[in-house]
Structure formats: C-alpha cells, structure tokens
C-alpha cells in the first residue's frame, strides 16, 4: 500500500524523528511511504480561535495536496481530529464539503491505521522500561482512540505498561489555550504530572507531541527524570 504522511507542525518543527520513525515502521511492514513537500498546517489554531475563514484557506490547500493520496496517515490525534471531524464541519453546506469528507474518510491517526486498518498489533518492537500512556483529548474524545495505542504497546517486548490515574485528563496544553490561559494550563499540567509520578514510570508515552512537550516542560521544572516519548519512537525500536 502507498501511504501518504501528513506531518503535524509540532512534529515537523520540534520532533522530526517521530515522523521519520513512522516511515521506518511502515516500511518495515512492507508499505511505500510518500511525503508531499507542499503540505502545511492543518488549520486547527485559527479554527479553534474562531477564525474559520482563515482556517478554510489552509484546509483547502491541504485538501488539494492530499487529493490523490490512497490513504493518509497522521502522527497526531489532535490534527487527525481536525481533518476527520472538523474539516467536514468547516465546509458544511459549501462546494468543498464532498472533498473534505473524502479526505476525512481516508485519513487515519497512526495507531488507528496500524490496528484498525491494517490489523497489526505487533510491529516487532522492543523497548525496555516502565511506561505510562497519556491520552490526548482529541484522539480520545473525537476519534475514540483509547484502545489502539495500548494494544500496540502491550505487544512491545520488555515494556511494562502501567495506567496512570485519570489517564484521560487533559494535560493543559490545548494549543492556543496554553497561550491564552497560561496559569490554568500550568495548573492542569501539574495535576497530570502528579499522576505520572505516582506510577513510577520511566517513560510517558503519547500519540500527540504537543501533549508531550507540555508534560516534559513541567516534569523538568519538578525535577522528575522521567522521559516523554512519542508512540512512534517506541514502536520503531527493535
């Protein structure tokens, strides 16, 4: 299968190794991977801030870039939800609605693609350590991705997966929320990191890099040596 990658801004700018590891995993499974250079932001920041006209401009560009893709895989539940759930809403009743729905139908968050599209649970990974998983809000609530990441992690050799208390609670990032309400954002993050600390985990894993960046910053401030790791970075290890 030819898989086209939709790489979120945070991965592109701050965590490119996570995108490269998705390529590594998909090629290990026998798939061809394509990365269109013309892709850009999914448009979520203006959409969430109420600038829907501006968000449509960005979304239209993305729809054009991925128009001919067989299947689109994205390394973020947040950006994945933007495409799968909110693109059709953004263009509801407009000429581009059909194209928005078409892109939504062929777009998958990475763990969803592996488990529910390909039927793969074991990618041959080995990652020694004790880890806990953080559910990003959009991936969990908009895409329903509670099980797929955990199913994949349960098949990673030498990985001890422990559930943190209230794993589904927001880390406090929320995109522009962290900028508009920094004190609330930090307080929410501190609650999340307290749950992390209780597990005694060496690693905090998530399928959203933005959540991991928020958690990493607070853990560093608290002096907690636990490391944040994207799901793809775990699954790429052998």
Question: Which role fits each region the language model picked out?
Answer:
Residues 1-238:
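Iron-sulfur cluster-binding electron-transfer modules in prokaryotic oxidoreductases
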């Amino acid at each position: 299968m030819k898989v086209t990658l939709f790489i979120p801004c945070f991965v592109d700018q701050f965590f490119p190794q996570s995108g490269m590891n998705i390529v590594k995993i998909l090629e290990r499974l026998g798939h061809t991977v394509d990365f269109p250079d013309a892709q850009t932001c999914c448009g979520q920041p203006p959409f969430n801030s109420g600038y829907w006209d501006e968000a449509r401009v960005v979304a239209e560009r993305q729809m054009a870039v991925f128009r001919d893709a067989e299947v689109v895989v994205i390394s973020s539940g947040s950006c994945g939800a933007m495409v799968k759930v909110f693109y059709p809403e953004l263009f509801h009743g407009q000429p581009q609605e059909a194209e928005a729905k078409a892109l939504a139908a062929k777009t998958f968050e990475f763990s969803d693609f592996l488990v529910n599209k390909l039927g793969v649970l074991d990618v041959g990974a080995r990652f020694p350590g004790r880890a806990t998983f953080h559910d990003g809000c959009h991936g969990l609530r908009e895409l329903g991705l509670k099980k797929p990441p955990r199913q994949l992690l349960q098949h990673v050799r030498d990985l001890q997966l422990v559930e943190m208390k209230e794993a589904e609670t927001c880390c406090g990032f929320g995109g522009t929320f962290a900028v508009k309400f920094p004190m609330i954002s930090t307080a929410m993050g501190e609650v999340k990191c307290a749950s992390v600390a209780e597990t005694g985990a060496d690693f905090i894993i998530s399928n959203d890099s933005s959540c991991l960046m928020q958690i990493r910053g607070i853990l560093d401030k608290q002096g907690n040596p636990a490391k944040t790791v994207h799901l793809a970075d775990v699954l790429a290890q052998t």
